[in-house]
Amino acid sequence: MASAVRGSRPWPRLGLQLQFAALLLGTLSPQVHTLRPENLLLVSTLDGSLHALSKQTGDLKWTLRDDPVIEGPMYVTEMAFLSDPADGSLYILGTQKQQGLMKLPFTIPELVHASPCRSSDGVFYTGRKQDAWFVVDPESGETQMTLTTEGPSTPRLYIGRTQYTVTMHDPRAPALRWNTTYRRYSAPPMDGSPGKYMSHLASCGMGLLLTVDPGSGTVLWTQDLGVPVMGVYTWHQDGLRQLPHLTLARDTLHFLALRWGHIRLPASGPRDTATLFSTLDTQLLMTLYVGKDETGFYVSKALVHTGVALVPRGLTLAPADGPTTDEVTLQVSGEREGSPSTAVRYPSGSVALPSQWLLIGHHELPPVLHTTMLRVHPTLGSGTAETRPPENTQAPAFFLELLSLSREKLWDSELHPEEKTPDSYLGLGPQDLLAASLTAVLLGGWILFVMRQQQPQVVEKQQETPLAPADFAHISQDAQSLHSGASRRSQKRLQSPSKQAQPLDDPEAEQLTVVGKISFNPKDVLGRGAGGTFVFRGQFEGRAVAVKRLLRECFGLVRREVQLLQESDRHPNVLRYFCTERGPQFHYIALELCRASLQEYVENPDLDRGGLEPEVVLQQLMSGLAHLHSLHIVHRDLKPGNILITGPDSQGLGRVVLSDFGLCKKLPAGRCSFSLHSGIPGTEGWMAPELLQLLPPDSPTSAVDIFSAGCVFYYVLSGGSHPFGDSLYRQANILTGAPCLAHLEEEVHDKVVARDLVGAMLSPLPQPRPSAPQVLAHPFFWSRAKQLQFFQDVSDWLEKESEQEPLVRALEAGGCAVVRDNWHEHISMPLQTDLRKFRSYKGTSVRDLLRAVRNKKHHYRELPVEVRQALGQVPDGFVQYFTNRFPRLLLHTHRAMRSCASESLFLPYYPPDSEARRPCPGATGR
């Protein structure tokens, strides 16, 4: 039974609420109103709650708790639907002929009304409808009773709610295919002129509700309910009536609030949003937002401004591991052969694990799928398996037009899709809409996660379904310590499965589990991952290790990962592997024990960093990656959670090591790319754009690791920020190729050099990205001594060249920005005086600036004391004196001299695979 909870107005969320706080000044004044049903605005939210707000002030009066609007199964093994809690609309992920999200031409209530029905493939569908009435005290929100068929009672405030349940059965298999429950309040639309009611705006994915006076456009109040708003109701003539409301993207509300904040307003009086919106040069588009809450995924239509990234219509949302198809053979190792197909089926007993990053966010409105169903209700229309374009996605840019359309065009089209006539569809057939649509679901490429909050449990007999290969060995980043698997230099083979897991006889170690040479305490959990993977603190031959436990069904994956570990762990920056044991139910891998992940290194200021500075961390990261690439191994899942920090060695220093080889790919001899037949590998927000393209021009290469490493570089250098923004839209921003390197924009030497490297690594095209050796050779990693030596070598090389030589012209091109117009004006007076004693230097010449650096270095001991004090100690202080004043000098000089990369003098400054290998201009006779 629903229960009521009296509450006060929730604490406003920082961000949007602060943006809107100014809007409320001068508009809200405390007033006392008689709390009658007509004075209440009732708002339903995704979690099933019904909130009573004051129409005048927006104050929360009470909350009626109930079951969630949408509930799906937690044990689905093949498919699921995306449901819209606003009206019960259903969406699928495509069919054999169509790609991407597609809307079904019926809702859950309509499907229940049409049941029982059967699809053409023999699957039966049943539906059940259950009604209930709640009698609520409008003053306190307390439920008086639930009205049932047993008898009436004295009503006070009647609220009706209907529950629709749809189930799918396959007579050829005893398991239930799919089921869902949808609940909605009984509330017809409010009659009357739209202009007489207040207008309401809600934010998708959040609980913010904004109420506006439709006459003046004045913002009346805001309220944050903490959960996305699904419906707005008023009490009229002894019953609920539904009011129209518009849902906007969170970023759109941010955008509007920020634009409002830059407009000058009178010192007093309400803010007129009509005037405000008239100043905005933007357009609002209708999109489909895919979100996730505690019960699973859901969809909701939302307006966005043109600055919000959208997932394109028709984008194939492949699962992380890729489902098997009729044309694909699943091998023992987990590899797949053959060409992919959109006719998807999942292996028996597997869990359909979707790519969350490809779902969550704003999508272009998908087309409507039309198909056939046996014994369909006549009101559902008819048609063949064709699609029609989505509704017009444009919405007005000005606020008052938006308010009017919210009650006319948008209200009619969005809240009542079932009222559209069949003539509005293209290519309609004579009958039956449901069967082929749901059949297409059985054959379509559906990969939606049916996830629930994982409960921490450490039991020997696990209940989880086997891991999909793409999620193999992923350790949850929510764990306090991530000591996930890695590798070690070892020639050990997989141990015999005859060894049984058994407890020790020692009373002091009675909690330990022993499998062969590995022992661990099941209660000492270091981390856990998807599908039943756990990592424990343990022992291997007296050495402290991390013990990674996986299901025995993952034998092929374990073997492949161990083989890659054995091959690659002959490097200090690849985690060490010790051995593998097999018990009756699990595999156990003994791995090097680490003390932190890179995520903890960045985000935990109290963590002992073991003497590792950010530049050292990134250099060791790239050193390990270069080693993998030299072995033709592509990691394919670089992210902070998979980069670990070892404990201090005898000198008190830690190491950065790469871990989690579950998605690694060994490229065959003679090949430099890999296919995506087995799905899109990686993690949301850290994947290269070529992995997400529908029709990439070329197969992905090791450059995908460089892109991921570029994201990690910026994450470390910025102290935890991501170059593609908020996690909700991160992957969509990657697709659009729009990184934001705001933390590296400052015009100082270190950030100028870092910005150049990170920008190259994040190139939207793989070809311009540097290789791992090129990254390591970039000036970003040069010591001060190497920088100074480079300046000296360049100056010596150019000393006798004329100003017309190509190399000198290349150095002087764009030199005005390098020397800041005249470098004489930016050095200290004692140094200026000393330079004038011996020769003349042109203040506009980059070559003369390098000459001054070289000469003062050569004659450092002969310089006056005040000049030496200004320059600092050689090499660190000396070179920083010049790079601090001329932050572009090093990078500019390095680019200009690239044509001399093949010369022996410059080999230390350019990688062996540098793009310039032609003879250096002016190198004759050197």
Swiss-Prot record:
UniProt organism field: Homo sapiens (Human)
Regulation: The kinase domain is activated by trans-autophosphorylation. Kinase activity is required for activation of the endoribonuclease domain.
GO cellular component: cytosol; endoplasmic reticulum; endoplasmic reticulum quality control compartment; IRE1-TRAF2-ASK1 complex
Ranges facing Lumenal side: 35-430
Topology, Cytoplasmic side: 452-926
Catalytic activity: L-seryl-[protein] + ATP = O-phospho-L-seryl-[protein] + ADP + H(+); L-threonyl-[protein] + ATP = O-phospho-L-threonyl-[protein] + ADP + H(+)
A Gene Ontology BP annotation from the UniProt entry: apoptotic chromosome condensation
Membrane topology per record: Single-pass type I membrane protein
EC number: 2.7.11.1, 3.1.26.-
Residues engaged in binding ATP: 526-534, 548
Name recorded for this polypeptide: Serine/threonine-protein kinase/endoribonuclease IRE2
Domain KEN: from-to ranges: 784-912
